[in-house]
Amino acid sequence: SGFQFNMSVGYDLDGIKLEKVDRFIEGMKDASAAPIFNECRQWLLDNLDRFDNLTKEDVESISPEICNCATLSTLHGCPPQEIERIASYLLTEKKVHTFIKCNPTLLGYEYARKLMDDMGYDYVAFGDFHFRDDLQYTDAVPMLQRLQKLADKKGLEFGVKITNTFPVDVKQNELPSEEMYMSGKSLYALSMSVAQKLAKDFDGKLRISYSGGADYFNITKIVDAGIWPVTMATTMLKPGGYERLEQIGQLFKAKEAAAFAGVSAEKVEAMVEAAKSDKHHVKAVKPLPSRKVKKPVPLTDCFIAPC
């Protein structure tokens, strides 16, 4: 329990309707006719002697129904009408549970700028273009309400994924482009602020899945607030890598998977306020010591990193 695959689809309806993408979606819903699924299944059956804890019954019980849920990724500047058309198509034609990935720009420029400044990220540069060009909060709420009603009518689940990465300006030649995308601990307060607004305005009834600075120190609070599933990436790019998942998994070892019972706006609000002074999220006043080592690190020499 507590684990599932999730399709990510985008970026426009015409592209999603293409035969190649449609075949991918249908293949995820039911892979029983997919050559690669049957090839892999047969390989397992033919090589059972190579495994200590895998039986014929285990292999035959692997469901071909891999995924029945899609997250809609939208490009910055995608019109709300296009977002709604795609989500409606996924719910009505593809009959999959659907989440829409939202952007931190829903907060408005003034809120985002002040929050970043207050947390020590005043050096992170961004203008108001994306805040004006992206989906506006006043358009998002009625759209999400309509899609929630449609999903209820179809007997499917609907929600949002909070949030996409946040476009900021390249100022120190960090990348050979004009923009780069902020993620990790600095994104957390922005993402949780979006979750707070939606939880409050939907009385906690809108499902929220999460990505944006989740790690060992905050993931239990996120889940306890009713926000899940949780996606992590930045924390695994740090020393320890995928081994960090073992530590995070231990946090949930004694927890039973529970049915969705709503998002607590109060808990989310408390998390936003706490993040503003949390050492794991604010910019350190003094530069932290470098995690880099001077010697070349072979693929298997990761034990020298200060995990």
Q: Which residue ranges define each predicted feature?
A:
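Active-site entrance/lid segments in N-terminal catalytic domains of soluble metabolic enzymes
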Residues: 1-156, 164-169
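Catalytic cores of alpha/beta
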Residues: 85-88, 213-232
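Glycine-enriched alpha-helix->loop->beta-strand junction motifs that scaffold or abut catalytic
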Residues: 94-96, 203-204, 224-229
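Conserved, mostly hydrophobic/aromatic
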Residues: 100, 160, 198, 222, ...
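Glycine-rich beta-to-alpha transition loops that act as phosphate-gripper elements at the mouths
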Residues: 164-166, 205-219
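Ferredoxin-type iron-sulfur electron-transfer modules and their immediate structural context
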Residues: 236-237, 243, 247-248, 252-307
